């Protein structure tokens, strides 16, 4: 499989796609699930409930946010791979996290949920043919391909892993 061309996604997604050098995106999705599964052993209880600044998310909230994004983006990939031309709305992650109870859920439970979501999504991506990978649709007012969505899913997790490592002094990989 090839990487998505820049015309397959909007500029806001470039930073995520750029974090994914792999060409076998299904393998990258799969391997990432195994890496995510090890996170709870790498984060102390004190760190999982700590935010590095006011109005910033705790590691628990970050992982909850990753589950929200996993759900939204896989739904987009499903709709587009089935040639559904209905424009899909964007979503604002800040009110999603604010409306959740992620801050009160142990990291281990949140990670288990994220891993379960990713593993449930993998069969969809494994079955896609080239026509489905190349299918496009509208989401958040931008044209995006199914292929780009998969790359964004992996890159988005990597983006947050980088932030957890830099701002929380955690070793996630």
Regions found by a protein language model. Give the residues of each.
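Short, contiguous alpha-helical
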Residues: 1-8, 12-15, 48-93, 119-123, ...
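Amphipathic, non-membrane alpha-helical segments in soluble helical-bundle scaffolds
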Residues: 22-30, 56, 60-63, 107-111, ...
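A glycine-rich, hydrophobic loop/mini-helix early in the fold
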Residues: 29-57
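Generic secondary-structure transition motif, activating predominantly at the C-termini of alpha-helices
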Residues: 17-21, 33, 44, 81, ...
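Short amphipathic alpha-helical segments at helix-loop
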Residues: 17-21, 58, 99-106, 141-145
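Acidic/histidine-rich alpha-helical segments that form the ligand environment
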Residues: 28-39, 95-134, 153
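Short, charged, low-complexity loops and linkers
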Residues: 11-27
